[in-house]
Structures are given as C-alpha cells and as structure tokens.
C-alpha cells in the first residue's frame, strides 16, 4: 500500500517540517500532502519542498475551489509540477464549507456539485492544451459572459506546456459527490473514512465508474484516506489529544445547519455525540465539547498504541480496498513502523 504524509497547513507562524518530509522520502513514502483553510495556502509550500526532494509526489489535500478560478489552480499545479521535474504533483481539490467560501473568499456557495464538475473539466482542458479553453457550465463558464462582462474575452491556450495527465483527486464525502469523484477524477481523498464504511461506499464508487464509461473501475483509481499514527503505551492519552481537533471541526468548522464534519460523524453512527459536541461548542463550552468526543470515534480513524496494537489494527486498513494511506504523525519511529507495514 502506498503511504502519504500529511503536513497540513501552518498555524500562526509558517513552519514546514522539512526533516520529516525528507525522512518520508528516504523511507519510500509515495506522497506528501499540504492543506489550506484561511491562512497558509496549499500550493506555495509544495514549490519549496519540490526543490528539496527528488521523488516523492506532492499533493494538495486540498486546494479549496473558491480560492482560485480553475485556470489559476491549473496554472499553479502545472507550474509546481514543472519545477519538480514533471509527473510529481497531485491536484487535490475540495469545496470547503459555506462559512469559508462566503466569509473568507467572498464567493457564493452556489451549487457545489456542479462547481466541482465545471472546475475539473476546465482544469483538464488547461492541462491537455488540445484547443483554446472554452467551457459552458452550470456554475462556471469560460469566457466569462455574466454581469459586468465587456464581452471581449476569448478562449486561450496555456503558454506553458504542462503535464497533460496531471492527476486530479477530489476530497468528497456525500453520496452525490463520491459518485462524481469516481466519474471524473483520478483519485479520491475520502472525508470521514474508516475501513468499516467501505461496503457502503463501494456501490457509490461503482455507480460513478459506470457513469464515466470506457471501462473505468477500481483498477488505476486511487483511494487514499488519512489516519493519525502514534506509538504509545497510553492509548487513552493519544485519543484525548485528537479530541480538540474533532470538537473544533464537528462543532465549529461550518454553520449549525451545514457542517460536513458533523454529517460525517453522524454517518459513522455517532449522531447523538455529534449533536452534543456542536451544541457545547457553539455555546462556547469548548472543554465540555472536547470531553463529549467518544474515544471510539477517534480510535477507529487512527492507529495509536503499542506497536503490536498498531500492527494488528493496520490490517483492517490494508484489506478494505484502499490503495494508499496518508498518515499524520510527529514520530519518526511511527513513520518507520508504517513503512515496514506497507511493504
């Protein structure tokens, strides 16, 4: 199984764990993944890492659609890929949530399903350079001809010859968007994934493959969820350290009535806990919200504990049908363990 390393986005000060990324490359990790929310962006750090590495793939997990027009996202991904020597960048895309889309980027939430479809179609046209890029979509059209347009825009072809098959992966979780991912993308970054959900998710993917036609299927399609990894004798302590982030995302990373992280928690069978966490978090009772996160919820989406426990629990991930696993860890020994398990 392929391994990825998630380094996420930076906090108040920009910090890149360069030594950790270099170790990942030495250990044979396949990819390193950045992210963005409303601070550091996902693309710029990859350009820096491209100069320091030789082989490891460079993924955005994810670039938010509202942050850039699709042509701009294609330009950024294609430029970094060229800097890295070609064939190394994975353009991971996602919609984020309405609070960030409208509050940070000043864009309408609109119809995310159709925005994803239009966005990917335009990026592919930019990469392929078969003809000047024109697209008539339900959410995005090129050239732009809406309110305020002068009517002088014309289709263009990228000056830079980019990788025409630069892979596009989608970070999705709802049924409609998972089907869309299987239909139009090269890979999937599943939201809220745990191995026991695969029997439910597989038919969604199969329906997307059917819509794509051309014999598309699981062969050649990459599925890479994320899991936190920590070697420790204190399992409960490791799970407790995960809970503040869960409480933040389930409780506050989205509107009360439109929070994808809460929806994912409900889908995994923790509906009562999800509702309670959100109520406490929005009431500014943050410590109580953290305490309301069940141990079981954190445990099944991570690999924590003594080496023997991690080794045993890894089998569920390895056997569930995914092609890769992106890990989050601060421990070199955990990276070494995962590299040995994935061989």
Please report, for each region that a protein language model flagged, where it lies by residue:
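Active-site-adjacent structural elements that line small-molecule/cofactor binding pockets in enzymes
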Residues: 1-343
């Amino acid at each position: 199984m392929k391994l990825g390393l998630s380094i996420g986005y930076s906090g108040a000060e920009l910090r890149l764990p360069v030594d950790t990324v270099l170790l990942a490359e030495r250990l044979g990790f396949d990819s390193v993944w950045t992210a963005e929310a409303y601070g550091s962006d996902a693309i710029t750090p990859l350009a820096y890492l491209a100069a320091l590495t030789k082989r490891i793939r460079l993924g955005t997990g994810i670039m938010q659609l509202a942050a850039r027009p699709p042509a701009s996202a294609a330009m950024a991904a294609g430029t970094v890929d060229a800097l890295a020597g070609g064939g190394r960048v994975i353009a991971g895309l996602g919609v984020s949530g309405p609070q960030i889309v409208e509050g940070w980027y000043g864009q309408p939430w609109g119809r995310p399903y159709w925005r994803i479809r239009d966005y990917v179609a335009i990026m592919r046209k930019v990469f392929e350079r078969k003809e000047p890029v024109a697209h008539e979509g339900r959410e995005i059209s090129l050239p732009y001809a809406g309110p305020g347009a002068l009517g002088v825009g014309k289709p263009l072809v990228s000056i830079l010859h980019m990788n025409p098959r630069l892979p596009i992966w989608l970070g999705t979780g709802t049924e409609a968007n998972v089907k869309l991912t299987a239909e139009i993308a090269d890979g999937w970054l599943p939201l809220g994934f745990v191995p026991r959900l695969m029997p439910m998710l597989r038919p969604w993917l199969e329906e997307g493959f059917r819509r794509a036609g051309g014999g598309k299927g699981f062969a050649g399609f990459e599925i890479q969820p994320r899991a936190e990894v920590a070697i420790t004798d204190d399992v409960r302590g490791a799970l407790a350290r995960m809970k503040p982030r869960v409480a933040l995302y389930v409780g506050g990373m989205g509107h009360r009535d439109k929070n994808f992280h809460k929806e994912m928690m409900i889908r995994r069978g923790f509906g009562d806990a999800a509702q309670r966490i959100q109520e406490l978090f929005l009431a500014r009772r943050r410590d109580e919200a953290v305490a309301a996160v069940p141990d079981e919820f954190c445990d099944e989406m991570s690999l924590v504990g003594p080496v023997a426990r991690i080794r045993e629990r890894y089998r569920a991930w390895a056997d569930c049908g995914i092609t890769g696993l992106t890990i989050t860890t601060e421990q070199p020994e955990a990276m070494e363990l995962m590299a040995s398990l994935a061989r």
